[in-house]
């Protein structure tokens, strides 16, 4: 095969000449007809090919899938980056989840509406969750701790029930000051009554009885 060179002819006619040569210089660029030819010197830009630039960023107008996750480095330890990664299975337990949000220490939540401070913070090392707002739940809020420790700790139902049962047992073993009915014997060193007996079922006071073997003005009993 012959090389195509300047002045090459076919059938006695020049193949390329000034009138039909498709390459044209345009400043530092070379155009093929009206299209720019990219080279090592003139590399394509992100805007030329609808790319997102590594250096300048950009916007994806549609869904993007990252099979290996998204990694976000942070200042204190660049070797232990944070990020969002695919989980190890279909589940919602400590052993299995669909995605993992990974942080060296904490995950913070901020509002983009005029607020610079975090309103929710999650400690990924021990699972502590702190919030400046209200915690609302449509279902039950459950705790694995058996008993409260701090003054502001919430209490479990079994702990409250146990305390109520203790109070009830104590109440059932005592006589109320406002009045009560004994189901057993009542023993005391002395009973003091402010009012004299006035009903057949009342216990009489000392000043309402005649003492055995005592001498009375009206005779001997």
From Swiss-Prot:
Entry annotated with the keyword Nucleotidyltransferase: no
InterPro entries in the cross-refs: Tail_fibre_p36 (IPR005601)
Pfam families listed in its UniProt record: Phage_T4_gp36
Keywords: Host-virus interaction, Late protein, Viral attachment to host adhesion receptor, Viral attachment to host cell, Viral tail fiber protein, Viral tail protein, Virion, Virus entry into host cell
Protein name in the entry: Long-tail fiber protein gp36
Major location (coarse): virion
Signal sequence residues: none
Complex formation: The long-tail fibers are trimeric, with a stoichiometry of gp34/gp37/gp36/gp35 of 3:3:3:1.
Gene name of this polypeptide: 36
Secreted listed as a keyword: no
Source organism per UniProt: Enterobacteria phage T4 (Bacteriophage T4)
Localization in the cell: Virion
């Amino acid at each position: 095969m012959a090389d195509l060179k300047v002045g090459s002819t076919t059938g006695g006619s020049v193949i390329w000449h000034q009138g039909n040569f498709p390459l044209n210089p345009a400043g530092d660029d070379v155009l093929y007809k009206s299209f720019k030819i990219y080279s090592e010197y003139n590399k394509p830009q992100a805007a030329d090919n609808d790319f997102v630039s590594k250096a300048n960023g950009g916007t994806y107008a549609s869904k993007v899938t990252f099979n290996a996750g998204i990694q976000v480095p942070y200042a204190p330890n660049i070797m232990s980056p944070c990020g969002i990664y695919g989980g190890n299975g279909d589940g919602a337990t400590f052993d299995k989840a669909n995605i993992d949000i990974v942080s060296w220490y904490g995950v913070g939540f901020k509002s983009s509406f005029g607020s610079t401070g975090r309103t929710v913070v999650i400690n990924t090392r021990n699972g502590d969750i702190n919030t400046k707002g209200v915690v609302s739940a449509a279902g039950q809020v459950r705790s694995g701790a058996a008993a409260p420790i701090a003054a502001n700790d919430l209490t479990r139902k079994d702990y409250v029930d146990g305390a109520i049962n203790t109070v009830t047992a104590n109440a059932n073993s005592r006589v109320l000051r406002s009045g009560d009915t004994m189901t057993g014997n009542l023993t005391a060193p002395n009973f003091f009554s402010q009012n004299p007996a006035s009903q057949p079922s009342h216990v009489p006071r000392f000043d309402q009885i005649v003492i055995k073997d005592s001498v009375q003005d009206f005779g001997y009993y």
